[in-house]
Amino acid sequence: MTRDKIIITGASSGLGEGMAREFAARGRSLGLAARRIDKLDALAAQLADDAGRVVVRALDVTDTDDVPRAFAELAEGLGGVDRVIVNAGLGKGAPIGTGNAAANLETVQTNLVGALAQAEAAMAIFRAQNHGHLVLISSISAVRGLPKAQAAYSASKAGVSALGQGLQAELAGSPIKVSVILPGYIETDINRGVKTKLMTETDAGVRAMVAAIESERRRSEVPAWPWKPIAAALRHLPDAVSAKLI
């Protein structure tokens, strides 16, 4: 099934922007949301010739009351919605108990509470129309609790994965599909400064993500190589080894 009308959050930069460009190249209609409306307006202008239709809406996903309003407005602008990609996220974080609780709380509020608010809004639409595809962008970091500055981030993404798994169990056999995507290291602003041999170039990473989304598999590590075997290994490796991998 082709999902022609797609909402993407966190679409002003990084993987969200990359997915918007890739889906636009496939002729899809896009509802793009992010905090930086100026960047969304500029992106929409660039995509106008390829995409079926592009509508934008400023949205801070931590404003949980505004999320359903934003989704309703975007769906109206698109003439409906077939897929929602819950992508908006934050990579801040600090070692727990070091006086930087605000950064960790903001990370969890954005990545997990914001994702829940988006899932609520998307699922309300999908339940009403009895079809749709909810895509939750998690992370390889969700597979294993990570130390230091990544502790809150990995916990927030583990929550996103668990949310997706719960919905999959509930919706099994229904016309509403749920996919959980776990990206590894892909070149974006959030990963700038990370030194690893496992980094994937942006365009290749985005293509892998879009291919996984289009497949509508329940769970996809992307790119599959090397992240699928790494994800499997992370569940069993000693802490010292897993921390070095991711």
Predicted regions and their residues:
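Conserved glycine-rich cofactor-binding loop
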Residues: S12-S13
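Conserved glycine-rich Rossmann-like NAD(P)H-binding loop of the short-chain dehydrogenase/reductase
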Residues: R26-L43
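Rossmann-fold cofactor-recognition segment
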Residues: L47-D65
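Substrate-binding pocket helix/loop in short-chain dehydrogenase/reductase
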Residues: P95-V108
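Active-site helix of classical SDR
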Residues: A119, S156
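Residue(s) in the substrate-gating loop at a strand-loop-helix junction
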Residues: S139
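C-terminal helical subdomain
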Residues: G173, V180, K195-A232
